[in-house]
């Protein structure tokens, strides 16, 4: 129709959701291009995996790296005196102000002075802080990390003694107090050394030093890279490998401990690991009259060592 020849078609209103009335002229063409591969989950900021990774990284930054050469603080009068007598290369002796000077304190100060070890008198509160409020009896001795022996050194110690070897190996013992108490018992009953795994085991820390009452300065403690391999080597060398477990099929009364022997002590909770148990010549249990299911690992080790010492005296 002539009157409608110039009529405009429908025109989209500006600002509607469908966008402008005309094209972008290619300005937004990039939006049509692919965005590439989806990044891994830990690289997507809002993904739970990314949040976990960020949290772990922050915790790692906060956690101080453990120094391989950090010193230990041996606490208590007997442990300190035993370390000094054994000529452990200590760097400082701390004496709390007001400490009563008995024979052990006097001896500790005298040995330290004779060997050029720094003697520092400090407020008791300072020694409390340095020891994390552990019992120190007014004395603390700063010593380097424990110098572990080689497993072969334990056999050499027994050979030099001229007596049948009496060794103790620990399996799954993670409490340093148990380690210290066992070291003390081994020394008390004529043993020649203690063997611990290099990994997943308690180590000779200041806590173990104190619990051992200084016996760790006299008795060698060795570390084994592979406990089972070392036990097999000792068995090939003539040692009887005796496991100690509440479910053992042999009672302590039936054990012959007069020959060379290594007693393997498992933890109170886990007991002996499967491979260690398989490598034992015998697994011994301690007969008990009461309803107690098991003894603490260090107590059980002491009972067995006392029985072996009795047999060897007979």
Curated annotation (Swiss-Prot):
Residues 1-73 are annotated as: Disordered. GO terms for cellular component: cytosol. SMART domains: SpoU_sub_bind. Transmembrane segments: none annotated. GO terms for molecular function: RNA binding; RNA methyltransferase activity. Residues 1-16, 49-65 have a biased composition (Basic residues). It is an enzyme of class 2 (transferase). Its EC number is 2.1.1.-. Pfam families: SpoU_methylase, SpoU_sub_bind. InterPro entries: Alpha/beta_knot_MTases, Ribosomal_eL30-like_sf, rRNA_MeTrfase_TrmH, SpoU_MeTrfase, SpoU_subst-bd, tRNA_m1G_MTases_N. It comes from the Bacteria. One of its GO terms (biological process) is methylation. S-adenosyl-L-methionine binds at residues 266, 286, 295. Keywords: Methyltransferase, S-adenosyl-L-methionine, Transferase. Gene3D superfamilies: 3.30.1330.30, 3.40.1280.10. NCBIfam families: rRNA_methyl_3. Belongs to the class IV-like SAM-binding methyltransferase superfamily. RNA methyltransferase TrmH family. This is Uncharacterized tRNA/rRNA methyltransferase Mkms_4822.
């Amino acid at each position: 129709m002539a009157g409608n020849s110039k009529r405009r078609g429908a025109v989209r209103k500006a600002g509607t959701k469908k966008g402008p009335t005309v094209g972008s002229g290619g300005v937004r063409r990039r939006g049509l291009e692919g965005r590439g591969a989806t990044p891994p989950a830990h690289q997507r900021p809002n993904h739970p995996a990314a949040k976990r990774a960020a949290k772990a990284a922050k915790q790692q930054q906060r956690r101080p790296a453990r120094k391989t050469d950090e010193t230990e603080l041996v606490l208590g009068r007997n442990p300190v005196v035993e370390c000094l007598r054994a000529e452990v290369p200590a760097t400082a002796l701390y004496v709390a102000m007001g400490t009563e000077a008995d024979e052990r304190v006097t001896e500790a100060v005298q040995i330290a002075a004779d060997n050029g070890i720094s003697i520092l008198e400090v407020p008791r509160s300072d020694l409390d802080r340095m020891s994390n409020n552990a019992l120190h009896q007014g004395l603390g001795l700063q010593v380097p990390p424990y110098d572990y022996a080689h497993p072969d050194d334990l056999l050499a110690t027994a050979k030099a003694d001229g007596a049948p070897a009496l060794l103790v190996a620990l399996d799954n013992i993670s409490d340093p107090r148990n380690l210290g108490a066992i070291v003390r018992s081994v020394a008390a009953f004529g043993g020649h050394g203690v063997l611990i795994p290099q990994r997943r085991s308690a180590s000779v820390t200041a806590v173990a030093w104190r619990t051992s009452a200084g016996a760790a300065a006299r008795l060698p403690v060795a570390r084994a890279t592979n406990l089972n391999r070392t036990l097999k080597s000792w068995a090939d060398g003539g040692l009887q490998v005796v496991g100690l477990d509440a479910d053992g099929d042999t009672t302590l009364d039936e054990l012959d401990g007069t020959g060379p022997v290594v007693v393997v002590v498992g933890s109170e909770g886990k007991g002996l690991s499967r491979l260690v148990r398989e490598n034992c010549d015998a697994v011994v249990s301690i007969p008990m009259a009461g309803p107690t299911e098991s003894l603490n690992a260090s107590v059980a080790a002491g009972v067995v060592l006392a029985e072996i010492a009795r047999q060897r005296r007979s």
